[in-house]
């Protein structure tokens, strides 16, 4: 199986899952608890990504709203309070290579920034401190 369950919930691609569990254990030794925000914030199927996308975006224009283009159509985020979301099929979550980390601020964020690269993880976007992506570990 290419996807592996991680505790307390969620799934990641096998190599990402092993690196996540190693990183989680190292964080625990430093008094930091790492966990996904929810089971849908690790691997997401295309259908899950589509459902989440359609909940956050609409076709009707909204002045000044963040946009995404999907299937040749411009979509507008429904509220500026909502975090942006990749189009279905365009997310690292769809590959099991991303995790949204719960409570990723303060000491948890500081620990991640200082240590994540040792385990093959990185922050993809500064604007999303909770979102980390697995890029692999050195051979």
Give the positions of each predicted feature:
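Cell-envelope/glycan interface and biosynthesis
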Residues: 1-139
